[in-house]
Amino acid sequence: MVQKRNHFLPYSLPLIGKEEIQEVTETLESGWLSKGPKVQQFEKEFAAFVGAKHAVAVNSCTAALFLALKAKGIGPGDEVITSPLTFSSTANTIIHTGATPVFADIDENTLNIDPVKLEAAVTPRTKAVVPVHFGGQSCDMDAILAVAQNHGLFVLEDAAHAVYTTYKQRMIGSIGDATAFSFYATKNLATGEGGMLTTDDEELADKIRVLSLHGMSKAAWNRYSSNGSWYYEVESPGYKMNMFDLQAALGLHQLKRLDDMQKRREEIAGRYQTAFQQIPGLITPFVHDDGRHAWHLYVLQVDEKKAGVTRSEMITALKDEYNIGTSVHFIPVHIHPYYQKQFGYKEADFPNAMNYYKRTLSLPLYPSMSDDDVDDVIEAVRDIVKGAD
């Protein structure tokens, strides 16, 4: 049996270097802590990175999704289709506009929304689709865009997991009508909290920018800079969802080191793939050959009959016997109590999402993991399955 680690290996950790710390320190010393020049610089550099014309920095991916839907006028009486395999915030943003979330089941291989089931879910009330690039694997955007074009739907990509993902040589963030990114602490690019909305639609970007800061026509940076004016106008009853400079200071240097961080993620995922594909009863992530996987998550599925162990037993053993942390992504949205009570969803409505959920766990995957850490995870999983024989 593999020995238990002396120190707990968490499921995820951000990689923060001296450059980020120095940038944050300089920002603190500048006296500009709220939305200001760092945010504008981060927006410009992130837009260039993904190949979009516009980027609007906000305080979360959730905010980016919500503001984009609001800016498009989506509200009561409308329906928005998304995947049941996502964090609840994706569906919650739809509800907060007054619209109704409608789910279309996932493809059992890619774990992304199935375009055929998406087409079947469209009704005369459907106004938008929110495809979720699960784990860092891109959705079938050609098929999704075809459905959207046929029905006149707004395509808002949930790319919370997809910083660095590509689809057919195009960076996610430059394909749909708009794309929402997350910079939460566990994400591939981390600012603690934070998000970004990218789009080529200038009018949409302007509306989101105004909505994100109280509906004011002039941002705080413009008002308080040496070239600004005290005067502002409120164009709509907006929200307080903007990013601030301390977050952007982190983001600027996270963006600079993203290539190196992604390379390490790919190395770790590659080792996992090689090791776990040789173990009966383990189902490794599917990887498209027409794009780049961001490897935000490494989700391992456990076939109980072949592996001789359940997903839950593996999670418990990794923690208690080997001192290794895991997580589960995600509990399908439609089985949460609120959604079942409010919309009448049943567990059996989306069998592919449920089948995946019942046998999945997310293993540690982050750039600061050492080779020894990776060895420990591989050997522990191998040991657990072997011990079940």
From Swiss-Prot:
Residue numbers of N6-(pyridoxal phosphate)lysine PTMs: K187
Cofactor(s) needed for function: pyridoxal 5'-phosphate
Family annotation (SUPFAM superfamilies): PLP-dependent transferases
Pfam family, one: DegT_DnrJ_EryC1
Molecular-function GO terms, alphabetical: pyridoxal phosphate binding; transaminase activity
A single GO BP: polysaccharide biosynthetic process
Superkingdom classification of source: Bacteria
Functional pathway: Spore coat biogenesis; spore coat polysaccharide biosynthesis
InterPro entries: DegT/StrS_aminotransferase (IPR000653), PyrdxlP-dep_Trfase (IPR015424), PyrdxlP-dep_Trfase_major (IPR015421), PyrdxlP-dep_Trfase_small (IPR015422)
Entry keywords, A to Z: Pyridoxal phosphate
Family: Belongs to the DegT/DnrJ/EryC1 family.
Protein name in UniProt: Spore coat polysaccharide biosynthesis protein SpsC
Organism field: Bacillus subtilis (strain 168)
